[in-house]
Structures are given as structure tokens and as C-alpha cells.
């Protein structure tokens, strides 16, 4: 085995070791049997014109962790709460949770915005509003421990949305999160006011919590599906091709660099041998 082949083999082994290590880390950290989910829609994108690292885009694979695992590490926080603690995930404040989406056949992966406790008498309490510096209002009461009627927020999330929901419209009086997708165009309001779900997302409704993204890791799977192929935007597929080309370029540079070293070593050897050639 020549030197160039050895370097290539070492590079491949390092890559495989990195992938294996990441897989093991994900398995241990997630505490789930199925720790990956492919994003099939654009509801969490921050821009509809291009893909971004650190943001959940169409075709990304998302690494999941169990609710108990995330809670034990303090990694389940609403947007309102996280504004006060500084906790951020996927380009904004608060946690991104995965929950069963009512009539939707796929689970929903959206951001938790605020937790509401049901008081049992037709009112709701939101303790995280105690130190919230943003603008909010409620038609039934300005007491955050006895909310009723229409709850509204002004200029929230990275998209600067104005959102609201009628607390009296919920079909289940259960404590839980109000949720919303990050997309500034397609997800302009709470899920609970967008025909996605009709009640707060309680702990029993949450399947898992998003931990990290694998950019464009699910594009090939979506391209093979008749149901979701149209969701893969051109820029997302181009981003995957760019990533593949990057790996090819790196390996090519390693290969040609080593070939140059081998050639240089061979020429030096010939030069030394020629000194003894009479």
C-alpha cells in the first residue's frame, strides 16, 4: 500500500469514526429508540429563499431527545421563559418540541411559546409573564394568574410577529404550551389559532424535544417520496450538493497533495541514486 492510499484510508477511517461517535452520542443522549426525524415542511424556516445552518429547514434531519432527558437538563423552556434565562435553540429563544398534530398524519415540530396552567374555573395562569418585558394583553383580565378571553402578544420571536388566541376556544381545558412555527410567512399565529391544534400541548402530548440538526440530512428521503418531493426547494437540494462537493474537494486535495509529496520523494530518490551512477 503506497503512501497516498494510506492517507486516503486514514481519512475514511477518521470520517467513519466521527460518524460512529456521533451516532453513539445521539443514541445515549436522546434516550429514545428512534432518535432522528426528517423535517417535511417549511414551517420552521426563518427565510423562504435559502437554507441556514442552525435553523430547522425543509429536508433537515433533526436529532431528538426524550422529554424526561430534556427536562432533567433544563432544556424545555418556552419562548417567554427563555427570553428571561437566555436559553436559545435553532435561531431563537425557547425549545422546539415535537407533538402529535391532531388530524395531521405527521407529528408537528414547532417552538414552545408560553406555558399556560388551567385553573379549573375557566381561567388560565401564566407565571412566566411575571418578569416578561415584552408587550402582551388579555381581554378578560390583566392578571397573569387569572387569564381569560383573547390573549395577545406584540412583536415576538425573530420574525417580530403579532399573535393572539382566544383562550375560551380551546377544546380541551388542559395545562400546556401554546406553540408556533418559526416561518415568518406561513406561520403567522399560534398553532392553536391556525387550524393545526385546538388546545395547549400538555406533557402527555409531547413526543420528544429537538436537540440538534443534521443539515439537509433528509433531503434524499423526501425526494424519494411522492407526498413530500414538492416540499424540497431548489435551494435546499443545491445546498446538499454543495456539501457533497465540499467533501469531494477535501478528499481530492488530500489525494493530490499526497501525490505531490510522493512524486517529490521519488524525484529526490532518483537524484540521490544518480550521484552514484558512474
Where are each of the predicted segments found?
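Surface-exposed intrinsically disordered loops and tails
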Residues: 77-88, 121-176, 189-198
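Alpha-helical transmembrane segments
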Residues: 4-15, 240-243
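Extended, compositionally biased low-complexity polar/Lys-Gly-rich tracts
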Residues: 59-63, 94-99, 107-111, 167, ...
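Juxtamembrane interface at the cytosolic side of transmembrane helices
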Residues: 2, 234-278
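Feature for secretory/organellar precursors and membrane-associated catalytic proteins
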Residues: 8-12, 18-141
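Short amphipathic alpha-helical surface micro-motifs
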Residues: 17-22, 91-94, 157-162, 182-192
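Extended, hydrophilic extramembrane loops/domains of integral membrane proteins
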Residues: 169-225
Amino acid at each position: 500500500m503506497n503512501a497516498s492510499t494510506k492517507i486516503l484510508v486514514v481519512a475514511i477511517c477518521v470520517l467513519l469514526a466521527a460518524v460512529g461517535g456521533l451516532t453513539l452520542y445521539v443514541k445515549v443522549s436522546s434516550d429514545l429508540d428512534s432518535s432522528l426525524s426528517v423535517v417535511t415542511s417549511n414551517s420552521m424556516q426563518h427565510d423562504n429563499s435559502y437554507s441556514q445552518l442552525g435553523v430547522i429547514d425543509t429536508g433537515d434531519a433533526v436529532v431528538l431527545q426524550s422529554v424526561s432527558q430534556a427536562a432533567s437538563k433544563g432544556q424545555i423552556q418556552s419562548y417567554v421563559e427563555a427570553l428571561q434565562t437566555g436559553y436559545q435553540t435553532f435561531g431563537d429563544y425557547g425549545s422546539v418540541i415535537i407533538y402529535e398534530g391532531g388530524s395531521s398524519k405527521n407529528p408537528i415540530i414547532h417552538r414552545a411559546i408560553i406555558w399556560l396552567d388551567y385553573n379549573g374555573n375557566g381561567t388560565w395562569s401564566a407565571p412566566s409573564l411575571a418578569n416578561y418585558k415584552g408587550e402582551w394583553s388579555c381581554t378578560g383580565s390583566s392578571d397573569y394568574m387569572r387569564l381569560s378571553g383573547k390573549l395577545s402578544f406584540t412583536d415576538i420571536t425573530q420574525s417580530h410577529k403579532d399573535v393572539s388566541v382566544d383562550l375560551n376556544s380551546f377544546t380541551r381545558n388542559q395545562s400546556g404550551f401554546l406553540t408556533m412555527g418559526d416561518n415568518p410567512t406561513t406561520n403567522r399565529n399560534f398553532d392553536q389559532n391556525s387550524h393545526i391544534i385546538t388546545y395547549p400541548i400538555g406533557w402527555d402530548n409531547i413526543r420528544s424535544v429537538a436537540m440538534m440538526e443534521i443539515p439537509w440530512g433528509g433531503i434524499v428521503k423526501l425526494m424519494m417520496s411522492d407526498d413530500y418531493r414538492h416540499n424540497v426547494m431548489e435551494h435546499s437540494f443545491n445546498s446538499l450538493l454543495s456539501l457533497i462537493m465540499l467533501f469531494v474537494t477535501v478528499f481530492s486535495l488530500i489525494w493530490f497533495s499526497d501525490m505531490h509529496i510522493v512524486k517529490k520523494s521519488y524525484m529526490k530518490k532518483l537524484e540521490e541514486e544518480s550521484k552514484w551512477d558512474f
